[in-house]
Amino acid sequence: QKSYGKKGQDVVEMNWKAIDAGVDAIHKVDVPASWSNPEADPAPKALAGRPELVKQIRDVMEPIARMDGDSLPVSSFVANANGEWEQGASAYEKRGTAVNVPEWDAAKCVGCNQCAFVCSHATIRPFLLTADELAAAPAQTKSRDNKLTPEYKFVMAVSPLDCMGCGECVTVCPTKAITMVPQDSQADQQAVFDYCVANISKKATKMADDTVMGSQFNQPLLEFSGSCAGCAETSYARLITQLFGEKMYISNATGCSSIWGGTASISPYTVNKDSGHGPAWCNSLFEDNAEHGLGLYIGQKTIRENLIKEIAEVAGSDKASAELKAAFEKFLETKNNTKANDEPAKALIAELEKAAAAGCEKSAEILKSKQFIAKKSVWIFGGDGWAY
């Protein structure tokens, strides 16, 4: 009466009725006796992956995921005191948040890969399988012939537990080969996706990496992030990692991209499964990203230029092998081309390792910074808040 009397007696009486209705609606819930003595949870399954990553998952990520992060002792983070975290943790989350997920119809598909191209979370991916690889795949694996690669079978794999259900793949598909269906109906496709990710490597084809179709056969080194469903930002970032990911530095402004890209212990950036290398990512202060990115560029450029001078001294020595001299010449021919410099850099490092093993102290010193020898690219990621 005191609170609502000024609004009229009708309003007061409606509040009284609401209170009475609440009291009348109370009913007893009988708790099963078995709840007082529950069975112990089964032991967690062994996790596959790099030992240091698995340890991070068990010791840090899992307690946080079950809302138990406040109980973690400081010792849990000692290995991360400098801010470094293992890459690839997001692949272990398997959140299963989507109500509906894509179902791929192999008969209607033309293999354009546009669905994978627009996917914000890298949860729908194309693979090319040999006959033996297809025979070893789960029985429920769907495949089709591909005119551009007749020696392989084409598979579009979907991860139901990582998909966010945005439906962008359906929107972009030119032949309506994808439909959204209840997640439960696609549960058996998780094994197909996991098999392809773990066992199928990229095949050499005539499809260029700088095309929509060809680029999507490259492993995405940004996957299963915490961005919103259908986020275009992560679609762009994922594509960049498919083109430059093993040799890229990212200076990231504070904003959405630092939240989905750098949440402590749950990095969506990952490493190439063959080389073990992935993007180097760092988050600057909100307003300083341009300077931070420029600093990264100048720093790695200066280190590399000094290394090349030192390698030139070793290669120019009378004691240098003919193989080392030839490898250095090949390296110099491509030193400003990130993609073309890859193999020459590996060959040069191999020759430097031989020289170091033979007692060349200068080569041994150079190899301490060998990660800077190959040509890299430096990227600045930021949103409107930073840019303007």
Regions found by a protein language model. Give the residues of each.
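Ferredoxin-type iron-sulfur electron-transfer modules and their immediate structural context
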Residues: 3-163, 170-379, 385-387
